[in-house]
UniProtKB/Swiss-Prot annotation:
Assembly and oligomerization: Heterodimer of a B chain and an A chain linked by two disulfide bonds.
Protein name in the entry: Insulin
Pro-peptide positions on chain: 57-87
Family: Belongs to the insulin family.
InterPro entries hit by this protein: Insulin, Insulin-like, Insulin-like_sf, Insulin_CS, Insulin_family
Keyword Secreted in annotation: yes
Cleavable signal peptide: 1-24
SMART domains associated with the record: IlGF (SM00078)
Cystine crosslinks: C31-C96, C43-C109, C95-C100
Length: 110
């Protein structure tokens, strides 16, 4: 019952976004609690796959992004750090940093 009371405002917002319900959800930035609520809505009883990283893990990953000293290219990340940044393809990168569709959200359902 508590889940429905949490999802009701999201459902009302989606209903008001546009005349076509299928288009109201396509290609949106979804971050934080909005992303979690959208996953609950899309996945329903199946649930969804989400393993958030602790703050310590995130800080350790960012520790590898060393900046170059003075001269040309100063302030740019080293190639290894750049390569690591390009390999990230999590739900936050897909739906919060970039935009994602309903179909991309379904990829995270169990």
């Amino acid at each position: 019952m508590a889940l429905w009371t949490r999802l009701l405002p999201l459902l009302a917002l989606l209903a008001l976004l546009g005349p076509d319900p299928a288009q109201a959800f396509v290609n949106q930035h979804l971050c934080g609690s909005h992303l979690v609520e959208a996953l609950y809505l899309v996945c329903g009883e199946r649930g969804f796959f989400y393993t958030p990283k602790s703050r310590r893990e995130v800080e350790e990953q960012q520790g590898g992004q060393v900046e170059l000293g003075g001269g040309p290219g100063a302030g740019l990340p080293q190639p290894l750090a750049l390569e690591m940044a390009l390999q990230k393809r999590g739900i936050v990168e897909q739906c919060c940093t970039s935009i994602c569709s309903l179909y991309q959200l379904e990829n995270y359902c169990n």
